[in-house]
């Protein structure tokens, strides 16, 4: 039996993750009180069916260390993974505004506004986030994208095979929170200053031609590939389920997109399981 504990910020997609796990054949329990967790696990320990349990901020102990200690203890005896759903504050505020739902902490004595409730929840859940095995940030994802991401990460962990995620981003929109390695490529020649190239993206052939005409672009691409290749065997040996490499330029449209696509395709051609994402382009397409 495998157990996945699903937690995270309210509005970040816990219910979506639980539905995906249910579709994958997991027996799912929503908002199980933490004090029942150990006894529940004992009752299903002989089952051959995988189990997923979601833990809400409302039913965690006041001393969160009790929960993290319990989870660490359980990890030594069963196959347990913690899936944590995260999202930035602006996204959570927007989602609550659109759905008009009440945040679970909004009615507490410590919170009088949605803004305060989100801040308190982030503070309360920080220790749990720090011990998560799978951390997903749903800020720029649609329900479909998040569902696919959850399925991808869980299936990768079940296969015990490292999944390589390459994502481009724009620094002006903020750093990705789920990256293991971040490469800043803002020092490279910028196609943005070429009027004919400005409307294009790093996926277009003229941008590729422009960037590959500069030796420093090709050298950086080679060095990033070499760095990852060098450390990949140790990362795989460490039983990681995924490796996320983020490459950022100013706007996330040209340089970072080109390098992310090229490097992702390079490792895919070597036989690795690779997922390529262009976060800024995805965001613009939705708009």
UniProtKB/Swiss-Prot annotation:
Protein family according to the UniProt entry? Belongs to the RapZ-like family.
Tell me which species this is from: Vibrio vulnificus (strain YJ016)
Which SUPFAM superfamilies does the record associate with it? P-loop containing nucleoside triphosphate hydrolases (SSF52540)
Protein role: Displays ATPase and GTPase activities.
Which pairs of positions does the record mark as disulfide bonds? none
Q: Which residues bind ATP?
A: 8-15
Name-wise, this protein is: Nucleotide-binding protein VV0445
InterPro entries linked: P-loop_NTPase, RapZ-like, RapZ-like_N, RapZ_C
One of the entry's Gene Ontology molecular-function terms is: ATP binding
Question: Where along the chain is GTP bound?
Answer: 56-59
Please, which domain of life does this record's source organism belong to?
Bacteria
Instruction: Give UniProt keywords alphabetically.
Output: ATP-binding, GTP-binding, Nucleotide-binding
Q: Which residues cross the membrane?
A: none
């Amino acid at each position: 039996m495998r157990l996945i504990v699903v937690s995270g910020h309210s509005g970040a997609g816990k219910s979506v993750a639980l539905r995906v796990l249910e579709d994958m054949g997991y027996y799912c329990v929503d908002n199980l009180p933490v004090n029942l967790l150990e006894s529940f696990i004992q009752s299903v320990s002989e089952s051959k069916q995988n189990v997923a349990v979601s833990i809400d901020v409302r039913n965690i102990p006041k001393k969160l260390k009790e929960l993290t200690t319990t989870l660490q203890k359980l990890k030594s005896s069963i196959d347990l993974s913690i899936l944590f759903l995260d999202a930035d504050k602006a996204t959570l505020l927007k989602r609550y505004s659109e759905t008009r739902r009440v945040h679970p902490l909004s009615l507490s004595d410590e919170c009088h506004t949605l803004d305060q409730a989100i801040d308190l929840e982030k503070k309360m859940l920080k220790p749990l986030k720090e011990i998560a095995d799978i951390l997903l940030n749903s800020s720029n994802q649609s329900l479909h994208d998040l569902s696919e991401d959850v399925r991808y990460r869980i299936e990768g962990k079940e296969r015990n095979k490292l999944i390589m995620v390459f994502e481009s981003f724009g620094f002006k929109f903020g750093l990705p929170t789920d990256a293991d390695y971040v490469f800043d490529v803002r020092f490279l020649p910028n196609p943005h200053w070429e009027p004919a190239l400005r409307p294009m993206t790093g996926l277009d052939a003229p941008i590729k031609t422009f960037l590959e005409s500069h030796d420093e672009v090709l050298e950086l691409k080679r060095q990033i590939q070499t760095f990852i290749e060098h450390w990949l065997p140790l990362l795989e040996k460490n039983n990681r389920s995924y490796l996320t490499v983020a490459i950022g330029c100013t706007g996330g449209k040209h340089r970072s997109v080109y390098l992310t696509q090229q490097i992702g395709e390079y490792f895919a051609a070597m036989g690795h399981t690779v997922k390529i994402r262009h976060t800024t382009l995805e965001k613009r397409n939705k708009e």
